[in-house]
Amino acid sequence: MGAQFHMDPDTYLEEIRADIPRYDELQERTIDAIPFAPGRILELGVGTGETTRRLLERYPDAEVIGLDSQPGMVFRAREMGIEVRLARMEDPLPDGPWDLVLSVLSVHHLQADGKQDLFRRVREQSRALVLGDVVVADVRVAELEKGVDFPDRAVDVAAWCDGGVVWEADDLAVIRATYE
């Protein structure tokens, strides 16, 4: 299991952009990797709602439900009108089926066995999975927090979710899996 991760919703975007200079590119590449126009989307680690906002710009008819383990982030996302539930990725997923399960910068907080368990549960309930996250790479850009961040190699994460790496730069990757 990953450790509990805490960020201030008021300063999150500023801090994440300072820590991850390619944050906005990662967001765009993740959304570009969605293989079809999804109807029902489950977002893991919704945070302040930035990814959901971008998703709904691209897919305005989609229904997005978000999960986050931080009450402050849940509150902030709800202020944006997003349906968000307070839950950890280790908890049972809300009832599917989901057209798409999507996560940006959240899954790396799980250790390898937690990632594999999550991907098994996602496969059972969704048509596709798209992840944009920090991975182990030769070049380290993002600062990692010991006991909180557990990145793995992109090829390993892709294998665990039966997917493939569709974009990789520095220590970031977008991974897509389809289960149709």
How would you label these PLM feature ranges?
Residues 110-121:
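A short, conserved alpha-helix within the catalytic core of class I
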Residues 102:
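A conserved beta-strand element that flanks and buttresses the S-adenosyl-L-methionine
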Residues 131-175:
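C-terminal alpha-helical "lid/dimerization" subdomain adjacent to the S-adenosyl-L-methionine
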Residues 21-37:
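Conserved alpha-helix/loop element of class I SAM-dependent methyltransferases that forms part
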Residues 6-24:
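Class I SAM-dependent methyltransferase Rossmann-like catalytic core
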Residues 44, 48-91:
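Class I SAM-dependent methyltransferase SAM/SAH-binding core
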Residues 106:
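Hydrophobic adenine-recognition pocket in adenosine-nucleotide-binding enzymes
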